[in-house]
UniProtKB/Swiss-Prot annotation:
The lineage of its organism: Eukaryota, Metazoa, Chordata, Craniata, Vertebrata. It comes from Mus musculus (Mouse). This is Cancer-related nucleoside-triphosphatase homolog. InterPro entries: AAA+_ATPase (IPR003593), Nuc-triphosphatase_THEP1 (IPR004948), P-loop_NTPase (IPR027417). Has nucleotide phosphatase activity towards ATP, GTP, CTP, TTP and UTP. Hydrolyzes nucleoside diphosphates with lower efficiency. Its EC number is 3.6.1.15. The modification N6-acetyllysine is found at K165. It holds the Pfam family NTPase_1. Belongs to the THEP1 NTPase family. The keyword Flavoprotein does not apply. ATP binds at residues 9-16, 109-116.
Amino acid sequence: MSRHVFLTGPPGVGKTTLIQKAIEVLQSSGLPVDGFYTQEVRQEGKRIGFDVVTLSGAQGPLSRVGSQPLPGKPECRVGQYVVNLDSFEQLALPVLRNAGSSCGPKHRVCIIDEIGKMELFSQPFIQAVRQMLSTPGIIVVGTIPVPKGKPLALVEEIRKRRDVKVFNVTRDNRNSLLPDIVAVVQSSRT
């Protein structure tokens, strides 16, 4: 039986929007929900990067176009974007660790949007995700990229897990998937 839910699909198809709708429904049903999502940062109509936003409202840069890496830090780049690993880890890791450690008798949902190339530069993040997927009582709802080019080890590991249900989000189905996503999470509580 599936315990965790992951959405996949091309960029811009609506994965994060679906995650945000699922958060609202799950919170209103009384389930504790924590985690983070990524959002585009635009300037004068152009995408200049991505921010990490925690569900408690903290926000910081994940990546920016053409920015310089911090002195003494290795450059982590995905295409035109330079990843700010320090900022990402300062925001995402405490949220994941908190969600995992505050697991009592009740189930908790941990939102991880997304597990992609930028985020996977962080070894502590990879370890935290694996920990979350293995912790009883934690239900992970996340996003993973469509397979393209060189496989991402953690993403492939997630796809192959028997306790993971992967929904492929398309423009045709994105407005009808929410009840299915919520149903998998709700059935994980029993």
